[in-house]
């Protein structure tokens, strides 16, 4: 009897830990993605999506063809110095809003000395929602010229971010509950930056029982005040 109980307990523990992840990128082609707004190039190199900066074009976005509401998103990213980038979440592109310009929440990728990677920006809408002036200790989480691991939890009105396990941003906002995810190649104004790249790989999403797999609040960044 004791063995049966032990077996059941082990089974339950394993079930609780079995988080369902879905890859958003198959490592081979861009099936399930579409390019929006600008003309920067996206290509696949060594199993990663590589965005290539281009002069004379606005911000370019590679967006999922599916929309997502509540989710946990993880990915690895790497960016060349001199660029800026981000990952859109719960974002939209509508003909009647700024001629289809992509807008919505953005996980910031910022290799500059400002070091706001992991902050939350509202692309083409309200600008900064959570700059890292609200959480200065997170400014050292991002590593230049190296692969970094990101985690984003968007559950209900809560959006929280981490880089390399360090909590970065934490907001409550209800403007957009559902939208696509997109990889940004930011516009550049310096010809010397043309051809520089930002890379993403191991992109995966969990949309099942996300509340169950949320990180405890004690391990999140301080809440931002949007008022």
Predicted regions and their residues:
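Carbohydrate-interacting regions of secretory-pathway proteins
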Residues: 19-227
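Positively charged n-region of N-terminal signal peptides that target proteins for export
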Residues: 1-5
